[in-house]
Amino acid sequence: MKKIKNNTTTITNIIASSGSFDIELIESLGTADYESLMEISASLAEDYGEKYLLTKNTINKYFNRSGALPIIARFENKIIGYIIGMPLELLSQEPWVRLDENYGKFNTLYTYAFVIKNDFKRKGYAKILKKVYISWAKKKEGILYNTGHVKSGISKKFKGQIKIIAEINNWQGTGKIFEYYRRNLDPEKIYEN
C-alpha cells in the first residue's frame, strides 16, 4: 500500500471530460482533497449511518492503495463524487468476501464506495461516473467481474449481465436489505485465458 507523507497535492489523469465536468483516475490523493471527500461521504452517512463517513485513515487506505481503482468526479474543479473499486483479495478482512466464488482468483473488482454530492444527484453525473468506472474496470488486467452491495432492487436497473448472488438483511447495521451482485465485464469471453 502506498503511503502519503505530507503530500498535499493530488495527482490524477483526466479520463473523461465534458465542459466543466471531469472524471479523473487518481494516482495519488493528496491531503488537500481529504476534506472534500469527507464532506461528500456525509450523504452516505445520512442514508446508512455514521460508519460510512470517510476518515483520513479510510481515505488513505482506499484511495491510495495499490491495486485499487479510485476515480473522482469534478465540476468546476471541485470534487462532487467518487467511486472506488477494490480487488476482492484486498478486502480479506471482511467475512463475506471469502464466500465469493471468485475470491482468490484475482478476477473481480468490488465497488467499495460510490457517491455523488446531493446537489449533483439526478443530473446525469453519477451515471457518467459509473460508465467510466465500468469501462476502466474492463481495462484492468485479469478483471472479468465487478461486484458490489446495493439496496434491494437497485441492481435490476443496471445494464449488462448482472446476477444477484445474495440478499443480506440489515447489511452492515443499516437496517436495510442489500443485494450482493456480480456483473460480468466480459460476457463474450474476449479477455479470459
What are these regions (language model features)?
Residues 60-72, 86-92, 110:
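A short helix-loop-beta-strand connector motif used in the catalytic cores of GNAT acetyltransferases and
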Residues 153-158:
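Short, charged/polar "capping" segments at the starts of alpha-helices
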Residues 113-116, 122-135:
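Conserved acetyl-CoA-binding loop-helix of GNAT-fold acetyltransferases
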Residues 58-59, 96-102, 165-169:
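Short, P/G- and charge-enriched loop/turn segments at secondary-structure junctions
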Residues 147-150, 161-180:
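Conserved catalytic-core motifs of GNAT/GCN5-like acyltransferases
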Residues 79, 83-113:
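Conserved acyl-donor/pantetheine-binding loop and adjacent beta-alpha core of acyl/acetyltransferases
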Residues 137-152:
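Conserved GNAT acetyl-CoA-binding A-motif
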Residues 5-58, 70-75, 79-80:
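Short amphipathic alpha-helix that is part of the acyltransferase structural core
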